[in-house]
Swiss-Prot record:
It comes from the Eukaryota. On the 2D-gel the determined pI of this protein is: 5.5, its MW is: 27.4 kDa. Keywords: Chloroplast, Plastid, Thylakoid. This is Unknown protein from spot 115 of 2D-PAGE of thylakoid. It comes from Pisum sativum (Garden pea). It is found in: Plastid, Chloroplast thylakoid.
Length: 14
């Protein structure tokens, strides 16, 4: 997971 959210969420890849 990018941050703590699911991969398909609005979380950035970095």
């Amino acid at each position: 997971s990018p941050t703590e959210q699911p991969y398909s969420s609005a979380a950035p890849l970095i």
